[in-house]
Amino acid sequence: SILIVALIAVSFLYSKFNKTQLDTLTEESNKLIQQDLINEEINEEIRTQKEYAIVEKTIKEYLTNIKNIYLEVEKLNSQINAEEIFSASNAEDGKFNNVDSLVDEYKEKSKEYLEQCISLIEEDSIMEAINNAELTAKKDYYVDLYKTVMLSDSMKNQLLKMEESVEKSRDNLIDKLTIVSNIKKFLEENSRYWNVKDDQLIFTNTNIMVQYYELLNELNS
């Protein structure tokens, strides 16, 4: 096991109970270190007991919180629907006045999510989680167990991978928002070549229509 030696090094195996709990915590920690935390489900079931369960729960909840940040950025990506954004109902006098505010909102939200993620993979934040946990007897021992797992090189690599996934998802979002802004600019600059009829954008110039759908395809690709 990846962590078994390290965990034993900070343990005091004075009873069968402690050995069993440490083995289980090690097993669960190794699973988290080896799995794809972004694309695979994090098993939040707590298999240990007493103070060990607090350590296990803190580890799993911490990783889940980071993953949830990634999922929030992905949700923003999925909510960019060009057909809705540039629907006839949003067109007014050849302009789409609500687009700029949507772009700014999504940029700001995604920036905040990325900043949260970067903060969570810092050592101070990682340790704050266990220091705030309701550990009672032999707190230093259980904090050391948590520290051995969460500050290990293997877990640091996992955290960096998660942060990279959040950053990549945000970059993808920014690219989409740039295209949305470009479509808005294109439609407004060529407003004389389209109008609204029966809740649809109707183009009067074939070349402009083709260019518009090319931009839409770029957004959806």
Regions found by a protein language model. Give the residues of each.
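A broad, low-amplitude sensor of folded, mature protein cores
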Residues: 1-14, 18, 152, 167, ...
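Leu/Val/Ala/Ile-rich N-terminal alpha-helices, chiefly Sec-type signal peptides and the beginnings
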Residues: 3, 7-107
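Extended amphipathic alpha-helical interaction segments
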Residues: 85, 89-197
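Alpha-helical oligomerization segments
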Residues: 182-221
